[in-house]
Amino acid sequence: MRKKRILFCGEATYLNTGYATYLREVMKVLYATQKYEIAEFASYGKDGDPRGVDIPWKFYGNLPTKDSQQQQYDEIPTNQFGEWKFESVLLDFLPDIVCDIRDFWMFEYQERSAFRPYFNWVIMPTVDAAPQNEQWLSTFCNADGVFNYSQWGHEVLEKESNGNIKCLGSAPPSADAAYQPVQDKNQHKINMGFSPSTKFIGTVMRNQRRKLFPDLFDAYRKFLETSGRNDVYLYCHTSYPDLGWDIPKLLNKYKIASKTLFTYSCADCNSSFPAFFSDAKRKCKICGSKNAGLASVQKGASYQYLSSIMNMFDLYIQYANSEGFGLPQVEAAACGVPVMSIDYSAMSSVIRNLGGTPLKVKTLYSELETGCDRAVPDNDYTAEKMKEFFDKSEQEINTLSKNTRLNFEKYYQWDKTAKKWEDYFDSVDIKPFEQTWGSLPRLHQPQPQTKTEMSSSE
């Protein structure tokens, strides 16, 4: 019996984005089984890119390789997600199964493909809020299988589709192997340039509207005022400038510029380092060039350095109005850092699995663009929980840290997640090739005109 042919659609697995990481780790496990013929259709990936040389499976880059293709690529926004090349990739690889793990608008074109009857379609959308848009639910209903990033998302789709979506449970991501606890946290802080007595509340979030930096800064300001602590700093691994918040304006508004650190990455020497905010560009501490900027997806820190940052944190906090998953929570837990998250969307599932602290939601509001409910956090409650955490003894915090790591090992492991995909792929009965890609062309001939002249009534 021939091997099943599986096409994974997502972001190029040599990138360090969340989607890329998920596909890379799952595909590595599945490829090692030697049970399937595997291919990757990579958004933001390019054929011939040297970063893809070591990829062992078949690779289809989505970016144009010729100047003549650029105009076609730029015509439709969804081409960046693969719409313009999808069918040519299908005709070359002839998959039995097509898999996509992204947002609805990144894969909905696959449902519209003329070749849809020829492949089993399994998706894992980022269900980050409720209620879900009716168009999204309709598309999910037409998939052959639907995984979810979280148990919360699974329950939302089950409820809102009245059981009509073929939900397969959750298949959550894990952290990269680089995220490990350090043996001596105090020495690690010294190595990173800080006093061992310095405490950190840390967050790793992109500078987007749904990441609630204004509320986080407000809660942290209130914590400083109510606790009287001067040894606890806020560390934000985020980008600026971006399409999100005006970070320097917020720092000034809440008077925390001298208490908040960021990660800068140098475009010249590729080094990263922590520093207080000093504009979008600053002098690199490593090589001295003036080309260091706040870390971003395009110019970011390595997993190894991000792990070093995470291991400085005493407490990790995820402060967003909604999350499809919120991977940094799990990455922090992998480093043994206790976690707090807003008690809404996927964060509700993750924070309970990790044994962390759910942060109270003050209210929900309906978002204009999507009709989904988004969370407004209770910043006073968050400030109170921050104070309670840092009032704990060192022994209590160490116990929390160990339990957080144990919960990470229990709930978030790549081999367990890949096994869920493997079990699904093995359960799919593939149709004979002659009924799909090898089927005869369906040619529709128009009715031949039998008269040279016809009346209007005819």
Residue ranges of predicted features:
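Conserved donor-binding/catalytic core segment of Leloir-type glycosyltransferases
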Residues: F8, F194-K211, F217-Y220, L234-C236
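A conserved mid-protein helix/loop that constitutes part of the nucleotide-sugar donor-binding site
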Residues: A20-R24, Q208-L224, W245
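Donor nucleotide-sugar binding/catalytic pocket of nucleotide-sugar-dependent glycosyltransferases
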Residues: N142-D184, L261-Y264
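A short helix/loop element that forms part of the nucleotide-sugar donor recognition site in Leloir-type
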Residues: Q180-F194
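Nucleotide-activated donor-binding/catalytic signature segment of Leloir-type glycosyltransferases, i.e.
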Residues: G244-S308
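Aromatic "clamp/platform" in nucleotide-sugar-dependent glycosyltransferases that forms part
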Residues: N321
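A short, well-ordered alpha-helix in the C-terminal region of glycosyltransferases
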Residues: E388, Q395-Y411
